[in-house]
């Protein structure tokens, strides 16, 4: 086992503080509309330019082990806030640094760390309650655009695109961000349900120019097993041919005799038909087939449920207004399922999302939810260079997360003003002793720090003067760092999602409290590398002839 180095008390706390400050100082220059960019060296490829706090934090690794522990604890604040709310990582870092700095002063003066922590926890609880109290819900396209614009570092183009995407696919819709081939940033919306399976044979194509199969008003057969035998498929084929409507077959696979017969009949014109593989794998495939059945008003023909393909009737088949199929994707538009069934399925999936513990499962469930409830929007991000594109794509992803957070929990006034207004919630925080009261005061002081930093980053205005002016006012009045004017910030479009501000404070207080109650730090002792040259290979020379 490697030998360990242990440092205690003020020595440990001082070194941890150095690490906290190094990381926080690098991150906080990015805060606010006047925040600067940070350039990050990459071993492979071009350097990355970013104004995203968590991206900066994740790149920082310090040489001193104890300092690095302090830095990594604050990095955790940024990462957790990013995971939960998608934005507010720089605010969280600034708050964590301020809480730890103020707390250390009091620990050095003899305050009990555990009581400071209790005071901090009680203060945060009351501030969060006050934030929820002053929060307002958003619904309009304009408000959504404002949140997106602020989170994308005051880029109104991105804000408008996100608002338009949400307008098209709904608040639960899936919005994906991809790199565009050209320089233009644009929004593309896929209506209806799309899944990533194309036609099984190019002979099913109806439009040779686009190489797509376009089927109007089809019947849809949904089967969860492979179809290889024509005998079991024949009865339902005859029934659908008699109805005069085209048929789309979705099954685990269609092969051999069955596929060959479908192709021949399609080419002869006796049957309007197209076949595709079912999307997904395993249990997820079953769930997605059930989604398609509910959307189209059909039934999954599954032996598990007691249905056999040879006994299927037209009543089992789903229906849709239109289906478009290319070599990679199938899109079902205007499914004929009942709204009650679709709504019940949506609520069922929402329940599964709430219970899900896996990020991957949650993402897949949200995709299914979106496909049932509206469609999928794709934001194609264009830029003139790869460096700019990556930076812009990261900003769009941040803005998208923040906008979703705003829809969930509402918005508060931005520019650091919401935390100033939430200070009045501290009047409800109860302290059992002087040290707990000090913990509450630490939060009071820390809540001012984001506003101070936003002003400091403008480089032209005194933070103390702005702070006093904002504290003396009420409501949405604050300092707009972009225009350097005092005004109603909500009317000016300077807003933050409540979830972002709340998560930033809760995560910052949590990690800063752990650091404050730390009394010892244990690290590996670095082994001194020997300066002796290595022994030449081949053993002892000059001993030839000895036996």
Curated annotation (Swiss-Prot):
One of its GO terms (molecular function) is ATP binding. The keyword Chaperone applies. Keywords: ATP-binding, Chaperone, Cytoplasm, Isomerase, Nucleotide-binding. GO terms for cellular component: cytoplasm. It comes from the Bacteria. It holds the Pfam family Cpn60_TCP1. It catalyses: ATP + H2O + a folded polypeptide = ADP + phosphate + an unfolded polypeptide. Forms a cylinder of 14 subunits composed of two heptameric rings stacked back-to-back. Interacts with the co-chaperonin GroES. ATP binds at residues 30-33, 51, 87-91, 415, 496. Its EC number is 5.6.1.7. Belongs to the chaperonin (HSP60) family. GO terms for biological process: protein refolding. This is Chaperonin GroEL. Together with its co-chaperonin GroES, plays an essential role in assisting protein folding. The GroEL-GroES system forms a nano-cage that allows encapsulation of the non-native substrate proteins and provides a physical environment optimized to promote and accelerate protein folding. Its main location: cytoplasm. It is found in: Cytoplasm.
């Amino acid at each position: 086992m490697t030998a360990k180095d242990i440092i205690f008390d003020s020595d440990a706390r001082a070194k941890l503080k150095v690490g906290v400050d190094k990381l926080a100082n690098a991150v906080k220059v990015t805060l606010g509309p006047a925040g600067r960019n940070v350039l990050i060296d990459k071993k492979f490829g071009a350097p990355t330019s970013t104004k995203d706090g968590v991206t900066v934090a994740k790149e920082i690794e310090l040489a001193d082990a104890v300092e690095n522990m302090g830095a990594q604890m604050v990095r955790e604040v940024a990462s957790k806030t990013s995971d939960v709310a998608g934005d507010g990582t720089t605010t969280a870092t600034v708050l964590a640094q301020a809480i730890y700095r103020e707390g250390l002063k009091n620990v050095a003066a003899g305050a009990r760390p555990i009581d400071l922590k209790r005071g901090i926890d009680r203060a945060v609880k009351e501030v969060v309650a006050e934030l929820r109290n002053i929060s307002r819900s958003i619904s309009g396209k304009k408000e959504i655009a404002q949140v997106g614009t602020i989170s994308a570092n005051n880029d109104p183009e991105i804000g408008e695109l996100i608002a338009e995407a949400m307008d098209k696919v709904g608040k639960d819709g899936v919005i994906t961000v991809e790199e565009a081939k050209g320089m233009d940033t644009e929004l593309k919306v896929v209506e209806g349900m799309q899944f990533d399976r194309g036609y099984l044979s190019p002979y099913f194509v109806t439009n040779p120019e686009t190489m797509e199969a376009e089927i109007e008003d089809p019947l849809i057969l949904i089967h969860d097993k492979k179809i290889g035998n024509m005998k079991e498929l024949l009865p339902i084929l005859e029934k659908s041919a008699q109805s005069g409507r085209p048929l789309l077959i979705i099954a685990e696979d269609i092969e051999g005799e069955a596929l060959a017969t479908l192709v021949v009949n399609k080419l002869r014109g006796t049957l309007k038909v197209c076949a595709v593989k079912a999307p997904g794998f395993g249990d997820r495939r079953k769930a997605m087939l059930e989604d398609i059945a509910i959307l189209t008003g059909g039934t999954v023909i599954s032996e598990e449920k007691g249905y056999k393909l040879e006994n299927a009737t037209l009543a089992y088949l789903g229906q849709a207004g239109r289906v478009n199929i290319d070599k990679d994707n199938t899109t079902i538009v205007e499914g004929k399922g009942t709204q009650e069934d679709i709504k019940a399925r949506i609520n069922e999936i929402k329940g599964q999302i709430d219970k899900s513990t896996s990020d991957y499962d949650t993402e897949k469930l949200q995709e299914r939810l979106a496909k049932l409830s509206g469609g999928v929007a794709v934001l194609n991000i264009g830029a003139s260079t790869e460096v700019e594109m990556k930076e812009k794509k990261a900003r769009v992803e941040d803005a998208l997360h923040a906008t979703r957070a705003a829809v969930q929990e509402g918005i508060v006034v931005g520019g650091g003003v919401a935390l100033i207004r939430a200070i009045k919630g501290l009047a409800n925080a109860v302290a059992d002793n002087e040290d707990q009261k000090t913990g509450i005061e630490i939060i009071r002081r820390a809540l001012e720090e984001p506003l101070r930093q936003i002003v400091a980053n403008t480089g032209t205005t005194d933070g103390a003067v702005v702070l006093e002016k904002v504290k003396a006012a009420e409501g949405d009045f604050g300092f707009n760092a972009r225009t350097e004017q005092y005004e109603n910030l909500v009317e000016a479009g300077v807003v933050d999602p409540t979830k972002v501000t709340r998560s930033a404070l809760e995560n910052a207080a949590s990690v800063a409290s752990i650091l404050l109650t730390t009394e010892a730090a244990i690290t590996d002792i670095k082994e001194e590398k020997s300066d002796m040259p290595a022994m030449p290979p081949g053993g002892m020379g000059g001993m030839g002839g000895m036996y």
